[in-house]
Amino acid sequence: MAIQEIRHPLIRHKLGLLRRADISTKNFRELAQEVTMLLTYEATKDLPVVDCEIEGWAGNVTTQRIAGKKITIVPILRAGIGMLDGVLNLIPSAKVSVLGLERDEATLEVRTYYKKLVPDVANRIAMIIDPMLATGNSLVAAIDVLKASGCKDIRVMVLVAAPEGIAKVETAHPDIQLYTASIDNGLNEHGYIVPGLGDAGDKIFGSVQKD
């Protein structure tokens, strides 16, 4: 599995702000989108381009445009929605597919409770977005769904990742590409990434309980 921890100074600075315990919902949302934009830049560096001729202000100009497969962005509900605009800011024509996953309390297995994929998903590059890669169970399930739908080129962008989750995904799906702003220390006894970001979904949607 191709794993890239993007150590750009801007990402490191913004990630430090995201980790603050006293961060506001507004600032968390904005920073999450900004880091996502920077990850998107890296995750799309290998997209093919072709030459095309356009009419410029001083005559015809040879420029380039992206060619090849089109992209579908796949946010995992609910926290993945907080990264969506960060990708769309750079790829505004991308189609959006949505996956909702939850753990079945009886079997402890991850199940899909919502799936809305674009009709031609099999012919697109699928870019999964989710702020946290913790245990890896949800991400493995999401990739399972996309592969069952015919996807061949699957890329994942997460803000922070735990080594345990990376290992699980790599075992199940060694052919995907993973981009993250940070590979953190690991999981605590409650399954949270340390140092992590806390509950990214709660922080994005403003549902953090105050003492």
From Swiss-Prot:
Enzyme class, spelled out: transferase
Pathway noted in the entry: Pyrimidine metabolism; UMP biosynthesis via salvage pathway; UMP from uracil: step 1/1
SUPFAM superfamilies: PRTase-like
UniProt record, GO biological process: UMP salvage; uracil salvage
Cofactors, names only: Mg(2+)
Catalysed reactions, semicolon-separated: UMP + diphosphate = 5-phospho-alpha-D-ribose 1-diphosphate + uracil
GO terms of molecular function: GTP binding; magnesium ion binding; uracil phosphoribosyltransferase activity
Enzyme Commission number(s) of this protein: 2.4.2.9
Cofactor: how and how many bound: Binds 1 Mg(2+) ion per subunit. The magnesium is bound as Mg-PRPP.
Binding, uracil: I193, G198, D199, A200
Pfam families: UPRTase
Residue positions binding 5-phospho-alpha-D-ribose 1-diphosphate: R78, R103, D130, P131, M132, L133, A134, T135, G136, N137, S138, D199
Regulation: Allosterically activated by GTP.
Domain of life: Bacteria
Transmembrane parts of this sequence: none
Keywords: Allosteric enzyme, Glycosyltransferase, GTP-binding, Magnesium, Nucleotide-binding, Transferase
Chain's role: Catalyzes the conversion of uracil and 5-phospho-alpha-D-ribose 1-diphosphate (PRPP) to UMP and diphosphate.
NCBIfam families xref list: PRK00129.1 (NF001097), upp (TIGR01091)
Family to which this protein belongs: Belongs to the UPRTase family.
Protein name listed in UniProt: Uracil phosphoribosyltransferase
Gene designation: upp
